Curated annotation (Swiss-Prot):
Entry's Gene Ontology cellular component terms: proton-transporting ATP synthase complex
SUPFAM superfamilies for this protein: C-terminal domain of alpha and beta subunits of F1 ATP synthase, N-terminal domain of alpha and beta subunits of F1 ATP synthase, P-loop containing nucleoside triphosphate hydrolases
Name of the protein in question: V-type ATP synthase alpha chain
InterPro entries assigned: ATP-synt_VA_C, ATP-synth_a_Xtn, ATP_synth_asu-like_sf, ATPase_a/bsu_AS, ATPase_F1/V1/A1_a/bsu_N, ATPase_F1/V1/A1_a/bsu_N_sf, ATPase_F1/V1/A1_a/bsu_nucl-bd, ATPase_F1/V1_b/a_C
Classification via Pfam families: ATP-synt_ab, ATP-synt_ab_N, ATP-synt_ab_Xtn, ATP-synt_VA_C
Top-level taxon of the source organism: Bacteria
Keyword Translocase: yes
EC number annotated for this UniProt entry: 7.1.2.2
Entry keyword set: ATP synthesis, ATP-binding, Hydrogen ion transport, Ion transport, Nucleotide-binding, Translocase, Transport
Function as written in the Swiss-Prot or TrEMBL entry: Produces ATP from ADP in the presence of a proton gradient across the membrane. The V-type alpha chain is a catalytic subunit.
Family of the protein in this entry: Belongs to the ATPase alpha/beta chains family.
Organism: Clostridium botulinum (strain Loch Maree / Type A3)
Length: 592
């Protein structure tokens, strides 16, 4: 495609204005300067194009050439995505290291997917079959746990003329489809523009929870498969550890982790831990289902904006195969700051705190690409894309624009609290501020698949925690002695809920993950203790005697009982019941 070459007119940080670009279109990818830096046109005025450059612009000068590719910023989708680590514009970091060394050289050009590696393609359709966009024509065993489905690209339909099994690269023809007089060659790779959501049949109502193994999330503030959630919190409150825990243990089949403008060490942690950690369902390393996008704080600011879209497009691709995908974006605040930077350079009218007026609509465009869908194609596959975004409000101020724009869109809010973090209560999700709007949808599933009284237990536990907050106000004013024995018991049970149930150690090999069965038994145990001690109080037993029971230590240590020995929790129920019966039969101190 021979398009006219433009010239750089002015440079302002990551923004380059070029003239002579009348043949280009908005969102076209361009190559800027002699080093062919990658950029994207974000505004057109007559023949002048404002270009967001995704690499360091030092050394560019007015008059340097600007060449348009005539294509929008797109990602390559095909075998080779899983276990890979890309930068914000889908350049594989391993390939860059092999080509240019430890540091990313400006203007380096490498293919996103390896063109030399061969994959074994197994057809599932045969010659003569009629196919349409979205139909699976064959599979590639990409890793031991991910079966990569090769789909007919959007816009192609017809009858299969040739299809064969064998080892192919991602650009080799694996099948030919004929529609009337037109024959299309199908390869294992597709290209898709990142700013456009991938098409699907229709959206479905999400009713199944995404089980994360984190008790405070699964019990009180669950997110559905295909839902949206945000994790806002001040520095040091544990946002990244929450995101890592979700990436490790969420029951999604594919995880896309975007490190957007955060520290490089956090991506290093993921690279070190994930190959060693085993998926609880398959027993395979977690890395075998993970795609990493690393756009750390020391990389150019503009690429942060692209990294979010790159990640969600890859997520949509796996969703279209019928997989449940979880996408973690850490942190969307850095993405919003990149928007603010470019908006300022474009001299647009600033909105709240200097962010552009379109911050809310851009955030909505991103989160609305989540969902549970019926994929294109005749097979009717169901896939889900769950999006969880971390937000880093300066000083933990939840009234700032990025948090407010996010809260208007997402259905689940896990509010991290610095006070809880300072008390070493992790995950520091504040149970009084957080909410989940999926509870009504999820409750029937929980009652059916976990236990019939799950919703009732959850409601009781939450009301106890809320009563504790009210009673603490009274204690602060007049002291604990002003409370009745029953109210003091409520405080003790709420403390047990906080410390023995909600608190969870992400770095303990057993406590890092709790199955729904274990969560149910632990929650029921704490509330059973409340019921039994109330029975004892009514029979005239002193509260102090009940609080000194040795069985309380066993309740506190129930979180460290492994999934294989889960029946040991049932033994604590029996022991507690026997101890209370003995106390009542003895009559306690009051009746001695």
């Amino acid at each position: 495609m021979n398009l006219k070459t433009g010239r750089v007119l002015k440079i302002s940080g990551p923004l380059v204005v070029a003239e002579g670009m009348e043949e280009a279109n908005i969102y076209d990818v361009v190559k800027v300067g002699e080093k062919r830096l990658i950029g994207e046109i974000i505004e057109m005025r007559e023949d002048r194009a404002s270009i967001q450059v995704y690499e360091e612009t030092a050394g560019l000068a007015p008059g340097d050439p600007v060449i348009t590719t005539g294509e929008p910023l797109s990602v390559e989708l095909g075998p080779g995505l899983i276990e890979a680590m890309f930068d914000g514009i889908q350049r594989p970091l391993n390939a860059i290291k092999a080509k240019a060394g430890d540091f990313i050289t400006r203007g380096v050009e490498v293919h996103s997917l390896d063109r030399d590696r061969k994959w074994h393609f197994t057809p599932v359709k045969k010659v003569g079959d009629t196919v349409e966009a979205g139909d699976v024509i064959g599979i590639v065993q990409e890793t031991s746990i991910v079966e990569h489905k090769i789909m007919v690209p959007y816009g192609i339909k017809g009858t299969i003329e040739t299809i064969e099994e064998g080892d192919f690269t991602v650009v080799d023809t694996v099948a030919k489809v004929k529609d009337k007089d037109k024959v299309s060659d199908l390869i294992m790779m597709q290209k898709w523009p990142v700013r456009r959501g991938r098409p699907y049949g229709r959206k479905l109502n999400p009713v199944e929870p995404m089980i994360t193994g984190q008790r405070v999330i699964d019990t009180f503030f669950p997110v559905t498969k295909g839902g949206t959630a945000c994790v806002p919190g001040p520095f040091g409150s544990g946002k990244t550890v929450v995101q890592h825990q979700l990436a490790k243990w969420a029951d999604a089949q594919i995880v896309v982790y975007i490190g957007c403008g955060e520290r490089g060490n956090e991506m290093t942690d993921v690279l070190n831990e994930f190959p060693e950690l085993k998926d609880p369902k398959t027993g395979e390393p977690l890395m075998k289902r993970t795609v990493l996008i690393a756009n750390t704080s020391n990389m150019p600011v503009a690429a942060r904006e692209a990294s979010i879209y790159t990640g969600i497009t890859i997520g949509e691709y796996f969703r279209d195969m019928g997989y449940s995908v979880a996408l973690m974006a850490d942190s969307t605040s850095r993405w919003a700051e990149a928007l603010r930077e470019m908006s300022g350079r474009l001299e647009e009218m600033p909105g709240d705190e200097g962010y552009p007026a379109y911050l809310g609509s851009r955030a909505a465009d991103f989160y609305e690409r989540a969902g549970k869908v019926l994929s294109l194609g005749s097979e009717g596959r169901e896939g889900a894309l769950t999006v969880i975004g971390a937000v880093s409000p300066p000083g933990g101020d939840l009234s700032e624009p990025v948090t407010q724009a996010t809260l208007r869109i997402v259905k689940v809010f896990w509010g991290l609290d610095s006070q809880l973090a300072y008390r070493r209560h992790f995950p520091a999700i504040n149970w009084l501020n957080s909410y989940s709007l999926y509870l009504e949808k999820i409750s029937p599933w929980m009652d059916e698949n976990v236990a019939s009284d799950w919703t009732a237990l959850r409601t009781r536990a939450m009301s106890l925690l809320q009563e504790e907050a009210n009673l603490e106000e009274i204690v602060r004013l007049v002291g604990i002695d002003a409370l009745s024995e029953k109210d003091r018991l409520k405080l003790e049970v709420a403390k047990s809920l906080r410390e023995d149930y909600l608190q969870q150690n992400a770095f303990h090999e057993v406590d890092t993950y709790a199955s729904l069965e274990k969560q149910y038994k632990m929650l029921k145990l704490v509330l059973f203790f409340y019921d039994e001690t109330q029975r004892a109080l009514n029979a005239g037993i002193y509260l102090k005697e009940l609080l000194d029971l040795e069985v309380r230590d066993k309740i506190a240590r129930a979180k460290y009982i492994s999934e294989e020995s889960i029946e040991n929790i049932d033994a604590i129920f029996n022991e507690l019941s026997e101890v209370i019966d003995q106390l009542i039969s003895k009559g306690g101190i009051m009746n001695a």
